[in-house]
Regions:
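Conserved GNAT acetyl-CoA-binding A-motif
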Residues: 12-25
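Alpha-helical hinge/cap motifs
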Residues: 1-2, 90
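Short glycine/proline-centered loop/turn elements that form peptide/ligand docking sites
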Residues: 2-5, 26-30
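A conserved short alpha-helix in the GNAT/GCN5 acetyltransferase fold that borders
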Residues: 4-14, 33, 99
Length: 192
């Protein structure tokens, strides 16, 4: 088994993919740890989400906290995760509402380029659309939130199990991000 996994890892490196993610069953996680993978999140009795960078997720959290003020006692911090494909007046309304109701708003723009509008354009539109809100901080989601990497389906028997696992994994990862940034609220909107 080691030889097969090593071969697959080498294939990814040859394709230019140096940051590798994987899902495994909980009882197989130690095997992948022995091959240089590190746990990001776990859904007990279901799956473990791992990466091949020892401090990949920790570095992501560190970069997030380095560019924003620390939440003080009695301050409210919120988060919004959006694709903004493209950034609309509805998106802007949600951000402005969160900005009025909180001291700090962390606005995460989905980084993965799987949308009609490229990420660089979406990010620029979002930043321009919230420039008048001094308490809003824009971040990239990287591969850790709302991406093809963070939505597992391979280990799930049915569609309901897939939906449940997606929600639980998002919750596990986001709770670590929320803790690092002092986030107490998460705003959610609906695309038309």
């Amino acid at each position: 088994m080691n030889a097969i996994v090593t071969h697959l890892i080498n294939e990814q490196y040859e394709r230019g993919n140096s940051h590798i993610f994987l899902y495994t069953k909980c009882n197989s996680a130690k095997f992948f740890q022995s091959l240089g993978f590190y746990e990001i999140a776990r859904i007990e009795d279901k799956l473990v989400f791992m990466e091949n960078q020892r401090k990949g997720f920790a570095n992501y959290l560190e970069n997030l906290t380095a560019c924003v003020p620390k939440v003080q006692a009695r301050q409210r911090a919120a988060a919004i995760v959006m694709n903004a494909n493209p950034f609309t007046l509805g998106h802007q309304y949600l951000v402005e509402k969160a900005s009025r109701e909180n001291d700090i708003v962390h606005l995460f723009v989905v980084s993965e380029d799987k949308s009609l509008v490229p990420f660089s354009v979406r990010k620029q539109l979002v930043e321009e659309g919230v420039v008048h809100l001094p308490n809003v901080y824009c971040h990239e989601t990287a591969s850790y939130m709302i991406s093809s990497v963070t939505f597992p389906s391979y280990f799930q028997e049915n569609e309901n199990a897939v939906i449940e696992s997606n929600a639980l994994l998002d919750l596990q990862i986001f709770s670590q991000i929320a803790k690092a940034l002092g986030i107490q609220r998460r705003y959610v909107g609906e695309e038309p």
